[in-house]
Amino acid sequence: ATLAVYPGEKVGLVGRNGCGKSTFLQIIAGTEEADAGQISRKQGLVTGYLPQEFELNDAATVGENIRAGAAELLGKIERFETANNLSPVEQEQLQQAIDHADGWNLESRLKILMREISTPPADRQVSYLSGGEKRRVGLCHALISQPGLLVLDEPTNHLDMEMRQALAN
């Protein structure tokens, strides 16, 4: 069977418990390898993934946990800003990658996401959050890198009705 998903489309999976929905999503997100068949996606496609059971760093703040979703981008920004021995080609490639991901606006995007998804304040310790608040932080974590593909496994777990409706839209 073939499944093709195009930009802007929403696809949902429905099936009984234990039939492999989560495993399929892990393969699509790139966190697991397929035993058979093949997955092809656009080269350089950034994927955001919120698994069914999402672990946050309880010792960190809300903001730190969300920023961790952009770790690769933050690494590129740091390398661009601190590396003195980059060739002009390497500098250009890093600049393009950062520009493409809108990396220079990461902090403003963080604030916008937190407001839109109604997360607790960025300096709040994660260990004090409810399940629904943690799920909102996890959603921001998946969205902060502006993924071209967003994979959500049981995205409405622990969310109130208002947030469930907002997520559906």
Where are these regions (language model features)?
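ABC ATP-binding cassette signature C-motif
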Residues: 1-169
